């Protein structure tokens, strides 16, 4: 039985993950963590998530380390915000707890810190900007398509709900990095984030990224390969957060077989090249 701790336990993703874990035969929720000094502290995590009573009380993040030790968690799952997640990963790995992280918006420095903490504490980890199985097939297909369409102009468009805080999305940034890498282009030099005013003629090297926010859009990502007289639009649409949660469950199950001291990706989880 895999013992799982969930941060952001009262959020949309955290609650969904808790509900899904209660439906599995090989894992259980042993800890539920919310923001420091959360007003929900003491509330049963299962009741809060709509999964029925679990006997696991929500605690504030100020008690993270003692909670992980007392619960003997095998894996911590984090879907929160970047600056909080970095601290969570640091503390969890120091406690010898493996991590599955779907939080987005990490800076290069924050991601480097995550990688260092996983390595220094020799724990197992899966960190991905998008846990959806379909999106990771999307990334894998982009990797194969891009060299073939290397002479096309490339634009990335993403759309999310009006509560999303970071832009462009982590998924759009991953797609951008996959494309730039396949074309041997420096992301720092070729990324163009929206356009306004007299920006001049589009260069052949640039890759555009555009963010739309509105309503309850779960997550749409389109990569346009635009040539003279034709274009290819490659799109992934998430209709429900359940697609991300299904990927989280796969990632949790992968952890026991993962290599220690390195950060695995969803490619590793899914066995993609």
UniProtKB/Swiss-Prot annotation:
Instruction: Name the chain's protein.
Output: 4-hydroxy-tetrahydrodipicolinate reductase
Q: Which residues bind NAD(+)?
A: 8-13, 34, 102-104, 128-131
Catalytic residues per the record?
Answer: 160, 164
State the reactions this protein catalyses. (S)-2,3,4,5-tetrahydrodipicolinate + NAD(+) + H2O = (2S,4S)-4-hydroxy-2,3,4,5-tetrahydrodipicolinate + NADH + H(+); (S)-2,3,4,5-tetrahydrodipicolinate + NADP(+) + H2O = (2S,4S)-4-hydroxy-2,3,4,5-tetrahydrodipicolinate + NADPH + H(+)
The UniProt entry's sequence similarity note says: Belongs to the DapB family.
- Which keywords belong to this entry? Amino-acid biosynthesis, Cytoplasm, Diaminopimelate biosynthesis, Lysine biosynthesis, NAD, NADP, Oxidoreductase
Q: Which Pfam families match?
A: DapB_C, DapB_N
SUPFAM superfamilies (alphabetical): Glyceraldehyde-3-phosphate dehydrogenase-like, C-terminal domain, NAD(P)-binding Rossmann-fold domains
Q: NCBIfam families recorded for this chain?
A: dapB
């Amino acid at each position: 039985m895999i013992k799982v701790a969930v941060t952001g336990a009262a959020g949309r993703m955290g609650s969904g993950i808790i509900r899904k874990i209660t439906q599995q035969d090989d894992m259980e929720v042993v800890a539920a963590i919310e923001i420091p000094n959360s007003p929900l502290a003491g509330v049963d995590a299962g009741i809060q998530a709509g999964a029925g009573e679990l006997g696991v009380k929500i605690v504030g993040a100020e008690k993270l380390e003692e909670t992980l030790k007392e619960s003997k968690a095998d894996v911590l799952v984090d879907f929160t915000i970047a600056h909080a997640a970095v601290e969570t990963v640091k503390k969890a790995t120091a406690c010898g707890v493996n991590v599955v992280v779907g939080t987005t918006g990490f800076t290069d420095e924050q991601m480097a810190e995550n990688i260092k903490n996983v390595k220094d504490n020799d724990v197992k980890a899966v960190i991905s900007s998008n846990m959806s199985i379909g999106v990771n097939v999307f990334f894998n297909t982009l990797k194969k398509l891009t060299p073939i369409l290397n002479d096309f102009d490339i634009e990335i468009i993403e759309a999310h709900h009006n509560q999303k805080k970071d832009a462009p999305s982590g998924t759009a940034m991953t797609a951008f990095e996959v494309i730039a890498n396949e074309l041997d282009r420096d992301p720092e030099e070729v990324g163009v984030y929206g356009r306004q005013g007299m920006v001049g003629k589009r260069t052949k090297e640039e890759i555009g990224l555009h963010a739309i926010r509105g309503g309850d859009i779960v997550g749409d990502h389109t990569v346009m390969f635009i040539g003279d007289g034709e274009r290819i639009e490659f799109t992934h649409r998430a209709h429900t957060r359940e697609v991300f949660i299904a990927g989280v469950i796969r990632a949790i199950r992968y952890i026991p077989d993962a290599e220690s001291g390195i950060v695995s990706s969803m490619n590793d989880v899914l066995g993609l090249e």
